[in-house]
A protein has these predicted regions:
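C-terminal and inter-domain tail/linker signature
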Residues: 1-116
Length: 116
């Protein structure tokens, strides 16, 4: 895969995350997540609806700030920070996403509380 595609995939993930996590525009977010989205996270119910329902369940003050982002072919890894969710510590997450035809189709993650 060439760098232009990988750059496009990174931009897609950042736009998708901003649309869902910060703007909370669920209708617009549907265009980024496949209806057959595979969720491997132990913290999120299966599928696109599981992810969307999780975000609907946290306070509207939720904010996502992306950090390092890397692409390798159809995979994008983004390390970011979730705050404003009502818990004492921000969540730090490394999300791995697989993209097919410009849509997020699969997700894995690792996360923990922010440490000073």
């Amino acid at each position: 895969m060439n760098r232009a595609v990988e750059s496009s995939n990174k931009a897609l993930v950042l736009e998708a995350f901003d649309t869902l996590f910060n703007e909370r525009d669920y209708v617009a977010a549907e265009r980024y997540w496949s209806p057959h989205y595979i969720q491997h996270s132990a913290h999120i119910e299966p599928g696109r609806d599981g992810l969307f329902n999780l975000i609907k369940s946290v306070p509207a003050t939720l904010k996502y700030e992306p950090g390092v982002i890397v692409a390798d072919g159809d995979f994008v890894i983004v390390h970011g920070r979730f705050s404003g969710h009502g818990r004492p510590k921000s969540w730090i997450a490394a999300d791995i996403l697989r993209i097919v035809d410009g849509v997020l189709v699969e997700h894995w993650d690792g996360q923990g509380g922010e440490t000073p």
